[in-house]
Design a protein with these regions (language model features):
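Transmembrane alpha-helices and adjacent helix-loop boundaries
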Residues: 1-257
Length: 257
């Protein structure tokens, strides 16, 4: 089968409503699942800091389970196995006037639970990178643990967390393709539906690959801006022109200091 450039350019530059719906749903699922993952990761990371084993052990088990099993298995298990076992079934719900299908709910929760395990380790590493003297200073000021984290530790840890956080969202965008197995009409399943009607497989899969490349590129640019924004306070001040030319001590002598 020859590659049809007309079909390729048509769906790339003038995407159908099915494509636009899948693209929108991919972005919505990614953002909501990432927000859930960050919230779970923060809670899990703070519990890991506790010296109480009753708080640490459940979190350790959660991180071990989510990171040690395939994401595809987690998605299928959450949506189908729980329903088949009579434990829980995702039903359609109405939220703010919109009907949210059960498979979309399961997709967001499954992706969020998986992401929370990875974010827990990222946030824990970011908190561990903060100098221990900051903790002692906060305790000397009489700060509670919550206030110490909110005012001193987490703002500094966020500078360390931003780069891997951006990478995790990049992965999340591509992981949304896995939820097509439970019937969520994201970008990949939308492409499969159009492919079954047009029989132009290579052209349409190349289009969806370029769409994902566009999404990850735009996010990469935004991530770079975030890293620059939160890394400004860690950068040393640029030296003066005379200091660069003559050296720091020579410049002081020229000014009579």
């Amino acid at each position: 089968m020859n590659f049809n450039w007309d079909v390729f350019w048509q769906y790339l530059l003038q995407p159908s409503g099915v494509y636009l719906t899948g693209l929108w749903l991919t972005c919505v699922i990614s953002v909501l699942a990432m927000a859930m993952g960050c919230a779970l990761g923060l809670a899990a990371a703070l519990l890991r800091l506790s010296r109480n084993p009753l708080l640490q052990l459940p979190v350790r088990f959660y991180v071990w389970l989510m990171r040690g099993t395939p994401l595809l298995v987690q998605i299928v298990f959450l949506y189908t196995a729980l329903a088949a076992g009579g434990i829980f079934r995702f039903e359609d719900v109405q939220l703010f006037g919109l009907v949210v299908p059960g498979n979309i709910q399961a997709a967001i929760i499954a992706l969020g639970l998986n992401e929370g395990a990875y974010m827990a380790e990222i946030i824990r590493a970011g908190i561990g990178a903060v100098d221990k003297g900051q903790y002692e200073a906060g305790r000397c000021l009489g700060m509670t643990f919550a206030k110490l984290m909110r005012r001193i530790v987490l703002p500094q840890a966020f500078r360390v967390i931003v780069p891997p956080l951006g990478n995790e969202f990049n992965v999340m965008l591509k992981n949304t393709t896995l939820v097509s197995v439970i019937g969520v009409q994201e970008l990949l399943l939308s492409t499969q539906m159009v492919t079954s009607a047009t029989f132009r497989v290579f052209e349409l899969y190349l289009v969806v690959a370029l769409y994902f490349l566009l999404l990850t590129t735009l996010w990469g640019l935004f991530q770079r801006c975030l890293e620059k924004r939160f890394g400004q306070s860690d950068r040393p001040a640029p030296p003066a022109a005379g200091s660069r030319m003559f050296g720091r001590h020579t410049f002081k002598l020229l000014r009579g200091r």
